[in-house]
Amino acid sequence: MLLSPKFSLSTIHVRLTAKGLLRNLRLPSGLRKNTVIFHTVEKGRQKNPRSLCIQTQTAPDVLSTERTLELADYKTKCENQSGFILHLKQLLSCGNTKFEALTVVIQHLLSEREEALKQHKTLSQELVSLRGELVAASSTCEKLEKARNDLQTAYEGFVQKLNQQHQTDQTELENRLKEFYTAECEKLQSIYIEEAEKYKTQLQEQFDNLNAAHETTKLEIEASHSEKVELLKKTYETSLSEIKKSHEMEKKLLENLLNEKQESLEKQINDLKSENDALNERLKSEEQKQLSREKANSKNPQVMYLEQELESLKAVLEIKNEKLHQQDLKLMKMEKLVDNNTTLVDKLTRFQQENEELKARMDRHMAISRQLSTEQAALQESLEKESKVNKRLSMENEELLWKLHNGDLCSPKRSPTSSAIPFQSPRNSGSFSSPSISPR
C-alpha cells in the first residue's frame, strides 16, 4: 500500500527542489557563465577585503568608473537571475500539478482494484450457490421422470378401459337408431303419401291457370306484334317512296346543271377556236404584205431594213396586245368557272349529306325491322319452350298418378337409400309448388 498523499507530496517536493531540478535544468551558456562569475566575485570579496580597501584609496577615479560599470552589469545579471528564478518556480508548479494528477489516478486505480476483488468474491459465492442448485434440480428431474413413467402406464390402462366402454355403447346406440329409423320411416311414408295427394291437386290447379294465362298472353302478343309489323311496314314504305322521289328530283336537277355547263363550255371552246383561226389569217396576210414590200423596196437596203424593223415591231406589239386581251378573257372565264364550281361543290356536299341522312334513316328502319323479326323469333321460341314445359309437366303428372295408383310409393320392401328420399320430402316441398314459369 502507498503512503498518504500529503506526506508523499511533501517528501517528493523537497527531493525535487534539492537534487533533481537544479541538475536537469538546461540554462543558456551566457547565464551559466554569469552565475559562475558572480560566485567567484563574492568569494574574492570575502577573502581579500583589505586589498580592496587599498585599491580604493590609491585610485578613486578608476574605481568610481568601474563601480558604475559593475553596478550596471550586476543590475542586468540580477534581472536575468530574477527571470530565471521565476521560470524555475513555474516549472516547479507544473511538476507539482502533474504529480498530484498521477497520485489521483493511482488512487482511482486502487479503488477500482478493490471493487474488482469484491465482485470476484461475490461471483465465486454465486457460483457455489448455483452448483448447489444444479444438484438439487438434477435430483428433482429424476423424480419427475419416474412420476411421468408411472402416470403414462396408468393412462394407457385407462384408455383401454374407455375404448372397451365406447365400443359397447356404440353397439347399443346402433341398435337403438335402427329401431328408431324403421319407425320414423313408416311415419314419413304415410306423411309423404298425404302430401303427394295435396301437391297433385295443387299442380293440377296451377297447370290449368298457367294454360289459360299462357293462351291469353299468346293471343295478346300475337295481336300487338302483327299491329307493330304492319305499322312499321307502312312507315317504311312511305319513307322509302319519299326518299326515292327526293333522290330522283335531286338527280334530275344535277343532270340539268351538268348539261348546261357542258353546253356553255363547248360554246367557249368554239369561240376560242374561231378567234384562233382569225388570228392565223391575219398573220398570213401580214406576211404576204411584208413580202410585197420587200420586193418593192429591194433597191434601198437601208430603207428596207428600217421598214422591216418597224413592221416587226408593229407585229410584235399587235401580237402582245392580242395575247393580253386573250389572257384577260381567259381570266374572266376562269373566274366565272371557279364561282360555278364552288356553287356546284356546295350543292354536291349538301346533297351528299342529305343522301347520308337518308341512308342512316334506311339503316335505322332496317335495324328496327330486324329487331322486330328477332323479337318475333324469340317469342316463338319462348312459346315453343312453354308448350314443351307444359307437355313435360303433364307427363310428370301422369307418371305421378300412375305411380300413386300402382302403389310404388307405399312399397314396404325398399332399400335404405330409397327411404332417405321421403325423409327429406317435407323440407323440399317447395319444389312441387314452384313449376318453371316463363317471364312472359
Curated annotation (Swiss-Prot):
Q: Where is the composition biased (Low complexity)?
A: 425-440
Q: Which residues cross the membrane?
A: none
Single GO BP term: cellular response to angiotensin
Q: Name one GO molecular function term.
A: microtubule binding
Key word Cell cycle present in the record?
A: yes
What GO terms fall under cellular component here?
A: cytoplasm; Golgi apparatus; mitochondrion; nucleus; plasma membrane
Decide whether keyword Phosphoprotein is in the record.
Answer: yes
Provide the free-text tissue specificity comment from this protein's UniProt record: Present in neurons (at protein level).
Superkingdom of the organism of origin: Eukaryota
Phosphoserine modification sites are: 373, 394, 415, 425, 429, 431, 433-434, 438
Disordered: region residues: 407-440
Q: Provide the protein's localization.
A: Mitochondrion; Golgi apparatus; Cell membrane; Nucleus
Report keywords, A-Z.
Cell cycle, Cell membrane, Coiled coil, Golgi apparatus, Membrane, Mitochondrion, Nucleus, Phosphoprotein
Among InterPro entries, the record links this protein to: MTUS1/CCDC69
Instruction: Name residues in a coiled coil.
Output: 106-401
Q: Which family does it belong to?
A: Belongs to the MTUS1 family.
Task performed by this protein: Cooperates with AGTR2 to inhibit ERK2 activation and cell proliferation. May be required for AGTR2 cell surface expression. Together with PTPN6, induces UBE2V2 expression upon angiotensin-II stimulation.
Q: How does it assemble?
A: Homodimer. Interacts with AGTR2. Interacts with PTPN6.
The name under which this protein is listed is Microtubule-associated tumor suppressor 1 homolog
